[in-house]
């Protein structure tokens, strides 16, 4: 009985190439489904795969089929009513989308959609396609390189600690074979000749003695071939490779004053998670600093940032001051790519908004790569929005956007991080 072993790279019954063709062909429909899925998902599920549903009419293929006109000769099975030459009425069926009788058709409306699943990587690839980190400039960070030691074959010289015994013995064997092969062949022939001469009566003793001397000389030369020589030694070679140090820090600043209800906080959290996933696809090392503020700001962990019930009044500048202090103490601007995302409902103590502008203008914007401010509210903008908006006229690394409902989160995110025209 024959046994077949499937050694294909793709899973049984699947084709990665065809899958990628399908995704590329219907990318617009899939991207729309991905965009819709972002608003439906819970915060904890935002980075998982997704079931994509595409209307059947969007994936229909051109096909040849019988037209509605013309004269046709057919033989219908089970005919007991008509004979050749009879004329019958054309069946009044639907256009292929219903259950009526009639000819098949590729038109008509149906309710069944084509549903398939995309993986987490495919989902994130579509989610962040055509996006980039704004104002990503080369500074000292790109000159700070780490050296990674890696194996680089073998070399003929090195320190004893790096000697490769197997390679050295293999080289020794090859050298000994090369240097003694001809002598061993000649020795074997000489020994055979000596045995034949000794079996022949009347052979001259001088001839036998000369042959024995030749054999001894060959054995001496073969024995003089050293077992191992410095020429045979092989050492493991190690080389250094430059590895650019790619590290970034993201400051998440969230207003938790009494005016920020749980729904508003949840929308802010969705935005932060999208930003985190986006940055992790660019940087290997990403640190996140969570700062909550009402009248006072405090650095917290992730759980407390999103779920703490602490609340109070609103002084936004306290968060900006704390962010600057943490950045100065732990994240030098010449070694880190610094990003910040601030979410608020825009409700701030009126006298504090100019202070926020001053902090951004003098201490924060000169150091950060990008500062994004999203205001989540259905009310009219207040002083904080106007102060932040005025900074956009002088700085290209700050952006302010308005979110009214959950459906606005993903479009706003794409607007903040869309690729800039060259």
From Swiss-Prot:
Q: Say which family it is in.
A: Belongs to the UPF0229 family.
UniProt biased composition (Basic and acidic residues): 70-90
Which stretches does the entry tag as region Disordered?
Answer: 60-111
Which InterPro entries has this protein been placed in? UPF0229
> What is the protein name stated in its UniProt record?
UPF0229 protein SO_2883
Q: Which residues cross the membrane?
A: none
């Amino acid at each position: 009985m024959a046994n077949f072993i499937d050694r294909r790279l793709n899973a049984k019954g699947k084709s990665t190439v065809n899958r990628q063709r399908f995704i590329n062909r219907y990318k617009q429909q899939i991207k729309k489904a991905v965009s819709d899925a972002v608003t439906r998902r819970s915060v904890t599920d935002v980075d998982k795969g997704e079931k994509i549903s595409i209307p059947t009419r969007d994936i229909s293929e051109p096909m040849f089929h019988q037209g509605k006109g013309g004269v046709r000769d057919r033989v219908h099975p089970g005919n007991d009513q008509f004979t050749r030459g009879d004329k019958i009425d054309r069946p009044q069926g639907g256009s292929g989308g219903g259950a009526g009788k009639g000819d098949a058709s590729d038109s008509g409306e149906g309710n069944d959609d084509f549903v398939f699943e995309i993986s987490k990587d495919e989902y994130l690839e579509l989610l962040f396609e055509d996006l980039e980190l704004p104002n990503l400039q080369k500074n000292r960070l790109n000159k700070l390189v780490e050296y990674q030691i890696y194996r680089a074959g073998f070399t003929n010289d090195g320190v004893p600690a790096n000697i490769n015994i197997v390679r050295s013995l293999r080289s020794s064997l090859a050298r000994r074979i090369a240097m003694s092969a001809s002598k061993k062949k000649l020795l074997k022939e000489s020994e055979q000749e000596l045995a034949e001469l000794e079996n022949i009566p009347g052979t001259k003793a001088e001839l036998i003695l000369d042959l024995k001397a030749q054999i001894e000389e060959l054995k001496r030369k073969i024995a003089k071939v050293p077992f191992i020589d410095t020429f045979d030694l092989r050492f493991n070679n190690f080389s250094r490779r430059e590895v650019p140090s790619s590290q970034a820090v993201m400051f998440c600043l969230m207003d938790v004053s009494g005016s920020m209800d749980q729904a508003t906080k949840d929308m802010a959290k969705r935005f932060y998670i999208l930003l985190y996933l986006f940055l992790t696809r660019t940087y290997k090392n990403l640190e996140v600093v969570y700062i909550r503020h009402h009248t006072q700001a405090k650095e917290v962990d992730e759980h407390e940032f999103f779920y703490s019930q602490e609340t109070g009044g609103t002084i936004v500048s306290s968060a900006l001051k704390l962010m600057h202090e943490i950045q100065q103490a732990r994240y030098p601007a010449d070694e880190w790519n610094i990003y910040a995302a601030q979410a608020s409902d825009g409700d701030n103590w009126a006298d504090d908004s100019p202070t926020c502008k001053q902090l951004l203008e003098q201490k924060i914007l000169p150091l950060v790569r990008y500062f994004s401010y999203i205001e989540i509210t259905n009310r009219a903008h207040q002083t904080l929005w106007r102060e932040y908006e005025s900074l956009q006229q002088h700085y290209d690394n700050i952006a302010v956007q308005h979110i009214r409902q959950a459906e606005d989160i993903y479009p706003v995110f794409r607007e903040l991080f869309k690729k800039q025209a060259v």
